[in-house]
Amino acid sequence: MAGRGVVEEIERLDPEKDFERISFLSTNHDFPWDVEQSLSLAFFKTYGIPSISALLDETAEFRDRPQKRYDDTELILAEILENGIDSERGREATRRMNRMHGRFEIRNDDYLYVLATFVLVPLRWNRRYGWRRYTRQEEQASLHYWRALGKRMNIRAIPDSIEDLERWSDEFERANLRFSESSRRVADQTLGLFLSWYPAPLRPLLRPAVLALLDDELLDAFGYHHPPAWLRHGLDLALRARATIVARLPRRSRPRLMTRERHRAYPGGYRLEELGVPGLEGRAPG
């Protein structure tokens, strides 16, 4: 499937019933790179909430096994999207995710905020940097997809519209986004992971570029200096230029499947039962 074929199929589908198919087509055919980048930013955004960062800091996973933690999260979400929420592998991936979280007392609002970032950050990225804009079906399907997954994680009171979810998220941030030492540590560890993927001489140049993608309120929550305006502007222009170029390239003929790609923590491939935090399985959240 290529070209207009993806959009044409999406336009024939119902976002309330066919949200899994729409999300798969959108993510794996048309926007694999964009979704990967925006979800990385979404994770960063959650670290600015002290109650979330304190838990991540306590587990020490980002300190001791940052690449495995990153790959496990990416692969669990990919297993669910590529195979289906209620497929055998999708259910097992969700079960493992629930058990990873189940030994900790996590507030429903913290769960809901993480889910909200997974909906809202990719939407905002697409509106600014997508090579085409999401259709209304894609936006609605994203909400229904994450609502369905959230319910299987026993997350309560998930708003049923993007507008309500955005209002809730903004209010939550105003009340909770602030500096904490745990936020700084987890942000430092994650930033160190991202930079480790590039040659050492480039890392001092790439660090401010990554920070330029974060908003000022989040930078303040991490205790980071704000990057210069010219860097933000230059990066914005570069990402918009990329979108213009990608729009003129031939469309992908086959989906990009994250589960089939090589991952640094699993150079020889992975088994589903390897995903998750060792020794931290317990009850599912309730």
Where are these regions (language model features)?
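Mature, function-bearing regions of proteins
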Residues: M1-G286
